[in-house]
């Protein structure tokens, strides 16, 4: 099971750089714009790899499967819309601007991390996702609507499909009795979660 899951992850990670291989820009970019574009391509791969590292460190095998499924679902929705809408990119390189694939994937990752592992991992992930979205606009690959749509798609999938990881959760049945009479009152479930 773990071998198949890791193979699927490797295939998805190898496919990610392909999303950055759109046609050549039809406008002149500054050195800064080219550098920011490259950094967004790097983060497109680095963020899921870091998330994978967190999950492996926590031995969260189920979470890895959920994350891979969310990434695949995000790619399907995003590319379905890209090929249905045919919006021209600001740099003129192709007609697949809406929605931003980079934004949708990194916001799926950030939402997954925030929901699954908490704010200590989630806040930096959202900051990086915000940088990627900004960088796609600055690098003339998208306009603001493209990255907002990508962020909305990614965040929705990540937040709706992820459950918090509670490795240290303990749940136990509890019977309550009246201290005066010793008679049974109700049954409940109690528990603790250690983070």
Regions found by a protein language model. Give the residues of each.
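Interfacial segments of alpha-helical transmembrane regions
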Residues: 54-73
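Hydrophobic core of alpha-helical transmembrane segments in multi-pass integral membrane proteins
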Residues: 47-53
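Residues at structural and domain junctions
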Residues: 50, 66-67, 110
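Hydrophobic alpha-helical membrane-embedded or membrane-associated segments
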Residues: 49, 70-74, 150, 154
């Amino acid at each position: 099971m773990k071998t198949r899951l890791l193979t699927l992850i490797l295939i998805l990670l190898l496919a990610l750089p392909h999303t950055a291989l759109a046609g050549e820009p039809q406008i002149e970019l500054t050195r800064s714009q080219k550098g920011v574009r490259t950094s967004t391509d790097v983060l497109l791969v680095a963020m899921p790899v870091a998330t994978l590292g967190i999950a492996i460190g926590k031995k969260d095998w189920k979470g890895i499967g959920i994350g891979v499924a969310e990434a695949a679902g995000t790619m399907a929705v995003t590319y379905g819309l890209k090929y249905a809408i045919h919006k021209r990119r600001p740099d003129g390189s192709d007609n697949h601007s809406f929605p931003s694939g980079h934004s949708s994937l990194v916001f799926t990752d950030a939402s997954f991390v925030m929901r699954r592992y908490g704010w200590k991992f989630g806040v930096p992930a959202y900051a990086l996702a915000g940088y990627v979205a900004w960088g796609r606009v600055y690098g003339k690959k998208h306009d603001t609507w493209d990255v907002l749509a990508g962020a909305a798609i990614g965040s929705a999938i990540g937040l709706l499909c992820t459950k918090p990881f509670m490795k240290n959760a303990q749940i136990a049945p509890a019977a309550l009795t009246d201290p005066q009479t010793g008679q049974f009152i109700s049954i409940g479930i109690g528990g603790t979660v250690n983070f």
